[in-house]
């Protein structure tokens, strides 16, 4: 846990401080008082009765002693339970395909008042310009949008072609920005463990802030070494004992439930009264359809309570206070005097039914957020422009030659997990000995004119058609999977024509496509419109076979080399356990 940074009263002047104290003493009038409310006590359990008194952005007082205190406005909570605003400990807003402005509109009314964001998706495409845009969005947001400075751009040096670099010098220029809380996930964990100086330089430069980790399945001496380097947390754990061991060794555990990686059921049994200060909730990657239909962090809290019997105060603790403490955001995470007035009023605390949200001391109106979204997006000066530097392709670009009797490597998908298995299949004149094998290709889109890297994919469930996307972690080249080279080419050419996006092809025709004009990653449509388009894409994709729940998000991780076991980048097949390229044909 890193408490070396403290943003408490970071933006408060001495005059504002004096006004806050005057209201706390009862010598001045509050801006708001929330009456008829019970406050969930995250520290001791149980509830605290009495009003919540607000002056400016901060809570001036809590409890029955303020029952008769004067206020400019009073809010009748109608018996609601008040909890601190929810915090997502680790996410990439770009993976929602929404801009930061649209993301705020979609999630703030659900109680998500704070996010800790790593914008490495757009930084991989556009470099520092992408980070600068996220910083501009964070500066103007009502939501507390904090940034971790992207540490691995690209994810792994020499393994893929991406659109830009993000040097240590550029990273340092953002280190002292008021919205920056630390260094984002250090994905090259073998490099850290082996003591590569370039990586240690980054860790040293941000050591006074929070150092995010990324080490799926790591254990033994390697895990000890990774933690010894100063890494403080991990969001990639997917096994119970893996999570327990990381907690034992002093790591904080981010329990992730995204649209593709779903680890909450595996890790929730770890949460208890003792270790909950070291446990946090995060989504990493969650799409707009799920946000609209199921929720965001509110959905995770609901499942902890309903499915895993986590006590109320512990469930809400890991959704707020634990994360605030971990990142040194000591002005957040509790409903207490001097804390920022980020408050969620719940008509039903067990079902996480949000009645009203206040952030920075002001009530949130969802309709007003929506009405101002377009103007706020324009004010942020989004980095528009076509980032696809790739000529149209033909079916011959995906031609692979196979020899009967030979064995070939297959990327074997595990539905709703980011890890894959490395399997193999024997080819004969009748095809492969597995009927679930289809083709996968990755095409770099940054003007290097490389031939497509091609491979085999199993377990995805694609029986016909093709899917293509420019959302392809972390370099965001074009990834396509399909049963025929002709349909793969059609899908790729559609996303090239769109300037980036997602596409479903079946029966030789484009069935559905979604343009993503910002970096080939994000739409400028409203959250509702985007959710409807995602729904149409998923419906079209389901016609291609029994695919994963979120086929495009699952497909996006098939090219990420820092998650085992077998992946495909623009450079070829990559063994994520040996951290080395391998061949399509099995020769050993």
Swiss-Prot record:
Alphabetized, the UniProt keywords read: Hydrolase, Manganese
Full protein name: Adenine deaminase
The cross-references to InterPro entries, in alphabetical order and at most eight, read: Adenine_deam (IPR006679), Adenine_deam_C (IPR026912), Amidohydro-rel (IPR006680), Metal-dep_hydrolase_composite (IPR011059), Metal_Hydrolase (IPR032466)
Q: Name one GO molecular function term.
A: adenine deaminase activity
Q: Which SUPFAM superfamilies match?
A: Composite domain of metallo-dependent hydrolases (SSF51338), Metallo-dependent hydrolases (SSF51556)
Source lineage: Bacteria, Pseudomonadati, Pseudomonadota, Gammaproteobacteria, Enterobacterales
> What biological process terms from GO does the record include?
adenine catabolic process
Which cofactors must be present for this protein to function? Mn(2+)
**CDD domains, A to Z:** AdeC
Which species does the entry assign this protein to? Answer: Escherichia coli O7:K1 (strain IAI39 / ExPEC)
Q: Assembly and partners?
A: Homodimer.
Q: Which HAMAP family match?
A: Adenine_deamin
The UniProt catalytic activity note for this protein reads: adenine + H2O + H(+) = hypoxanthine + NH4(+)
Query: What's this protein's family per the entry?
Result: Belongs to the metallo-dependent hydrolases superfamily. Adenine deaminase family.
Q: Which NCBIfam families match?
A: ade, PRK10027.1
What's the short name of a Pfam family annotated to this entry?
A: Amidohydro_1
Kindly indicate whether the keyword Heme belongs to this entry. Answer: no
Enzyme Commission no: 3.5.4.2
